[in-house]
């Protein structure tokens, strides 16, 4: 963590000491996240889908190297269901998990002109993620009778951690004032404070942004 912060500060100071160029981008995109949970010898995964929206500010040296920082709202939803029967009575259950995050990516980037209107770039760095909301809604049925358990606030359990740091990178292109990019981030921290349960998440993103 300290090395990451020191690297970011050093790169920022280097750009400030040179003739830097700043650019704002505002964008939205698709998210696909997979949470992997290990409790003892039992391993389970929960895929979720959603979207992100926010803005990013990039400072470059005008020669292809830059550093960017942004703030994004992320929304993810996942559902898991199962069915069975006991003594001839049909049973069913479904759990829906909704999560919202504030994500702050800090990325180093390298870019190169393809032609007068097209630029390609690579980016990599950490994303500091703070959970804003996490709920689980349970639904079930017994013999055709539907039941609901209501929504449970997952953060009411002190063992579930709001904070996460993800590391990753991606590729993108700028065409005029339009940006397309794809990225992948891997969670570094255990989302549970308990030693008996380990949960980490990976996030794939694809989005579009407008450059100003």
Where are these regions (language model features)?
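Bacterial Sec-dependent N-terminal signal peptides
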Residues: 1-29, 208-212
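A short, acidic, flexible beta-alpha connecting loop/helix-capping segment that sits on the rim
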Residues: 185-189
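Short glycine/proline- and aromatic-enriched beta-strand/turn motifs that initiate or cap beta-hairpins
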Residues: 20-56
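Gram-negative (and chloroplast) outer-membrane scaffold detector with strong preference
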Residues: 28-30, 56-139, 204-212
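Repeated loop/turn-to-beta-strand initiation elements of outer-membrane beta-barrel proteins
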Residues: 24, 63-67, 177-182
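Extracellular/periplasm-exposed beta-strand and loop segments of Gram-negative cell-envelope proteins
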Residues: 34-48, 76-101, 131-168, 190-192, ...
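Outer membrane beta-barrel transmembrane domains
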Residues: 160-165, 170, 174, 179-183, ...
């Amino acid at each position: 963590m300290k090395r990451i912060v020191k690297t970011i500060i050093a790169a920022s100071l280097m750009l400030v000491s040179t003739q830097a160029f700043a650019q704002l981008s505002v964008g939205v995109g698709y998210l696909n996240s997979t949470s992997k949970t290990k409790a003892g010898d039992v391993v389970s995964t929960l895929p979720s889908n959603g979207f992100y929206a926010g803005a990013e500010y990039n400072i470059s040296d005008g020669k292809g190297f830059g550093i960017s920082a942004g703030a994004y709202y992320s929304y993810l939803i996942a559902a898991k269901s199962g069915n069975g029967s006991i003594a001839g009575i049909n049973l069913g259950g479904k759990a829906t998990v909704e999560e919202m995050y504030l994500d702050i990516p800090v990325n180093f980037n390298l870019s190169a002109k393809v032609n007068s209107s097209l630029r390609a770039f690579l980016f990599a760095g950490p994303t500091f993620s703070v959970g804003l909301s996490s709920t689980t809604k349970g639904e079930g049925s017994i013999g055709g009778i539907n039941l609901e358990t209501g929504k449970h606030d997952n953060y009411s359990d002190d063992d579930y951690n709001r904070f996460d740091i993800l590391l990753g990178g991606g590729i993108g292109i700028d065409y005029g004032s339009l940006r397309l990019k794809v990225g992948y981030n891997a969670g570094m921290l255990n989302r549970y404070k308990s030693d008996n349960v380990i949960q980490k998440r990976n996030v794939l993103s694809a989005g579009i942004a407008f450059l100003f």
